[in-house]
Curated annotation (Swiss-Prot):
Coiled coil: none annotated. Its main location: cytoplasm. InterPro entries: RecX_HTH_1st, RecX_HTH_2nd, RecX_HTH_3rd, Regulatory_RecX, WH-like_DNA-bd_sf. It comes from Pseudomonas syringae pv. tomato (strain ATCC BAA-871 / DC3000). One of its GO terms (biological process) is regulation of DNA repair. It comes from the Bacteria. It is found in: Cytoplasm. GO terms for cellular component: cytoplasm. Modulates RecA activity. Keywords: Cytoplasm. The lineage of its organism: Bacteria, Pseudomonadati, Pseudomonadota, Gammaproteobacteria, Pseudomonadales. Belongs to the RecX family. This is Regulatory protein RecX.
Length: 155
């Protein structure tokens, strides 16, 4: 039987359980607690307290999310869009992408190498296919163009 979330203690316990599994953003944690039936005013108070105690941190969430998605082979545009959909501030998202320490050109090269075995496209159709794949993964078109023309990051 699911726990009844009608007291601050129960809401805090549930929020802590969710945070123990992985970092969450405030918007995401609020949504999950509401889905479990917690009243909005109690959620806000509980989350404010978690922020004060340093247990809920947007910057930690952004850092872990960007790192995880970059390791999974996604580019900055895709990660930016996913974070914007999660209701995070655009300035915070941009800062996290800048400070993550990921070399996006190297990541693009790794993803391309893994998917296409380093085979440069021989015709326009193959170039378009590879470009679409890399674009869908969230890499900028200028980087993709340099890579597929054989110039890589040597500009």
């Amino acid at each position: 039987m699911p726990a009844v979330l009608d007291t601050p203690v129960a809401i805090r316990r549930t929020a802590m359980d969710l945070l123990a599994r992985r970092e969450h953003g405030r918007v995401e944690l609020t949504r999950k607690l509401r889905q479990r039936g917690a009243p909005p005013e109690l959620i806000e108070a509980a989350l404010d307290r978690l922020v004060e105690e340093g247990l809920l941190s947007e910057s930690r969430y952004l850092e872990s999310f960007v790192s995880y998605r970059a390791r999974s082979g996604y580019g900055p545009a895709r990660i930016r869009e996913e974070l914007n959909q999660r209701g995070l501030q655009r300035a915070d998202v941009e800062r996290a992408l800048k400070e993550c320490g990921v070399n996006w050109q190297e990541k693009l090269q790794e993803v391309w190498q893994r998917k296409f075995a380093g085979e440069l496209p021989v015709d326009a159709r193959e170039r378009a296919r590879q470009g679409r794949f890399l674009s869908y993964r969230g890499y900028p078109l200028d980087m993709i163009g340099r890579l597929l023309s054989g110039r890589g990051g040597d500009d």
